[in-house]
Each structure stands twice: as structure tokens, then as C-alpha cells.
């Protein structure tokens, strides 16, 4: 059993970065909850614990103590950035070697495959959550809330889902997680070779009330609006999508 500890940065009285109508503490929690659901619903032999599951104040020491006491195999701290930049970057503790560096390289690559952010690079820092954890640890900074372009992306629930998906893909690859045997019925409305086209259609679907997710697989950006264990539920969503004038089909995976 692989034990993944997910740390949504900030929370409660600690808002984190705030700009353009966004609060970091809300974005990190949304991303972490989506990531947890992906891992637990889609993969075998993985256990997930979050440092917080609501808007509560949790100290840095409480976060690392919880991960250490639980015996986590990996500590993942999710953040959004501020300070005038743009894009994605991640951090590990200075001077550490494998497997921390190996996991970081995989996570960095998989996140940027599906998240439309500029690559700001792989960095090191003496952050508490990287220093005081007894297992490999990574802190990701997913866009700048004070950058207009980044902020517009972060306001989209579909984009938050894509951030979570990138993290999930990275964890699955880093820890060789196996997919659940039970196939899901997935509802897809399109597939594109360019991410911009997929993001545009996802935004259109979201505007019509669908939960859209852009997934990069088989060299295509696929726009998915649902995944179900029941084929009947998938077919019901297909009809809703067709009524909204989307070309839709179901596939199993």
C-alpha cells in the first residue's frame, strides 16, 4: 500500500496569496480534494491522507507531524504563487538525492504535460514541509494569482481539475500505481492535438453546466465530462450533452 500525504497549503486564518478575486487557500483545497478522489477512485493499493479537508488553520508543524506519524511514503504540498511572475515551479529540499529527485522529475514532467503553464523550472528551498518530513517531499506552485492570465485559468474548475490530473498522473507513474480493474464508462465530447482547442471546448461545456476535464492521453487532449461505473448514468449524461449540442460518445477505461 502506497501512502500519499497531500498538503493543501494555507487555510483558515492563513489565506495565502490573494489577488484577482482568488484566495490561495481555496484553490489548494479544491486541487487536493480532486487529487484525492482521482487517486482513490482510479488506482489500487493507494492510501491518501490530507493535512486538512476544510477551511481550517493547520500549523506547519502539525502538517509534518501528521505525515511522519502516519508513515507516509510521499509528502506533496500544493500551493499557488504570487509576486509578479507566471507559470509552474516546484521545490525539493536542497542537497537531497534519489528517490526525491527522481519523483520530482516525474511529477514536474507529468504536470506540465496537462497544465497550460510556463515552466519556471525545478528548484530547491529550505521550506519547513520539505525539511521536517521524514519521507521524500515535493512542494508545487501552480500559477500566480496576481498574474491576470494565470488567474483567469485558475478561476476555471476544469483547469483546477487538470492541475489535479497532472499531479495524479505523476504520482501514478512515480509509484507504479495500478489502475482499478473495474472499468469506468467515460463520456467524451472531443479530442484535439492542441491543448488550446481542448481548453476552449472545456470552457464552453463548463459554461453550460458540465464538469469538464482535459486529459492528455495517446498524444491527444481529450475533453471528458463524466466517468461512471454505471453505463446507464453515462448514457444519461450523453443525452444531456447532445441536448446541449455537443458531439458525445462513451468509452470504457
Swiss-Prot record:
GO terms for biological process: cell wall organization; peptidoglycan catabolic process. Pfam families: Amidase_3 (PF01520), SPOR (PF05036). Coiled coil: none annotated. Residues 4-172 form the MurNAc-LAA domain. Keywords: Cell wall biogenesis/degradation, Hydrolase, Repeat, Secreted. The keyword Isomerase does not apply. Residues 179-253 form the SPOR domain. It is an enzyme of class 3 (hydrolase). Its EC number is 3.5.1.28. GO terms for molecular function: N-acetylmuramoyl-L-alanine amidase activity; peptidoglycan binding. Sequence repeats lie at residues 184-219, 220-253. GO terms for cellular component: extracellular region; outer membrane-bounded periplasmic space. Belongs to the N-acetylmuramoyl-L-alanine amidase 3 family. Hydrolyzes the cell wall of M.luteus more efficiently than that of B.licheniformis and B.subtilis. The C-terminal region, including the repeats, determines substrate specificity. This is N-acetylmuramoyl-L-alanine amidase CwlM. It comes from Bacillus licheniformis.
